[in-house]
Amino acid sequence: MELNKGKSLLAGVAVLFSGALLTACGQSKGASEKLVLNWMTSAEIITMDPSKATDATSFTQMENTMEGLYQLDKDNQAKEALATKAAQSKDGLTWTFDLRKDGKWSNGQAVTAKDFVYSWQRTVNPKTASQYSYIFSGIKNADAIVAGKKAPSSLGVKALGKYKLQVKLDHKLPYFKLLLAFPVFFP
């Protein structure tokens, strides 16, 4: 009789455990649609401003929450992110990028070519004092703008349409796509 009580108790525990497991795995109809991601960093995030960032933690967080024209794949090769297509002129000095139309800011507004123009002009503007403005060297007029000799609006970047961006270079940059994956070039 003791054996039957033990089997009954074991069966009861198994049924309760199975029920609890199935209840935990099931999704109720009233479940919230809101998804939350908790993220930890090894250090305080100094800024999420691409023009102002200088530390690895800030750059890592931007890479995890934003996109530029390109991103680096597992082999550190540039692959399209917000860019869907890139065309380079025969002389290698003009690049034209078509942007994804589904790119959105956190408030739901579309990411457009004008956002890139604004961000890049802001980064090279001496008033912004970006420590990474030098990395724009090679883009038309960037060096003169950083030196305070030309207006930021003369930077070789232009919105040709809502989702079409043109970049003019002073000289060929064989590594240009790789540069565009760096957060300083994010919108």
PLM regions and their residue ranges:
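Short, well-ordered beta-strand elements
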Residues: E33-I46, T84, T94-F97, F116-S119, ...
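Extracytoplasmic/secreted proteins, especially bacterial periplasmic and envelope-associated proteins
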Residues: Q61-N64, Q77, A81, V111, ...
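N-terminal lobe/hinge region of extracytoplasmic solute-binding protein
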Residues: T41-K90
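C-terminal motif of bacterial Sec signal peptides marking the signal peptidase cleavage site
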Residues: L22-A24
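Bacterial signal peptide processing site
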Residues: G26-S28
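Aromatic- and charge-enriched surface segment that lines or borders ligand/interaction sites
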Residues: K85-Y132
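Bacterial N-terminal signal peptides that target proteins for export
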Residues: E2-A11
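Surface-exposed binding/hinge segments that line
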Residues: Y132-P187
